[in-house]
């Protein structure tokens, strides 16, 4: 069974900080051409910063799913619920839709009956939720993969580009792995061409998009485990020295 997470005071982890006044990972960072108030922002997240943020969020999810007294499903992971401090350390916040999973083994696929309607935000909700499937840790993983796709393409999953059956996932999958730079955030490419050789940047993007695509598989059982996502992204981070 599951029940609402009414307090997060007992959820202690470096990358879990609900309710704190930190800046969200929203348009100011991911879509600098449309910053707050409509002004154009010159601040672009570097490749290293994006990978570090992605790792922080993966570690937070892994803690929620696997290292508490009971698994916790966030149910609404999206950029505005990822909070950044002054050092660009990411913390996952807003547990308003989160659920404690009681009597579940987080190491197996055990969806929890969804009796109160779809949980989450359009664009980040896994397909099984829309078909009446129960909430699960795999659902959070799907939302995480979508977050990764947005972070490295600067495209929202609800972008008008994605019509007629196309999605942000199919957009990236069509370019993976040979043409990943064609779908990557242009501002990221322009910034990193001064810091990384083209081959190194492309290899890093391939690794990140591999994680994102594995996390957003249609079948929940096929999705990557958070610990595997952490391992692969840590390899990308370590490549920067």
Predicted feature residues:
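Cytosolic eukaryotic protein kinase-like domains
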Residues: 1-52, 88, 92-241
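Catalytic core of carbohydrate-active enzymes
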Residues: 56
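Protein kinase catalytic-loop region centered on the HRD/HxD motif
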Residues: 59-72
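Conserved catalytic-loop position in the HRD/HxD motif
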Residues: 76, 81
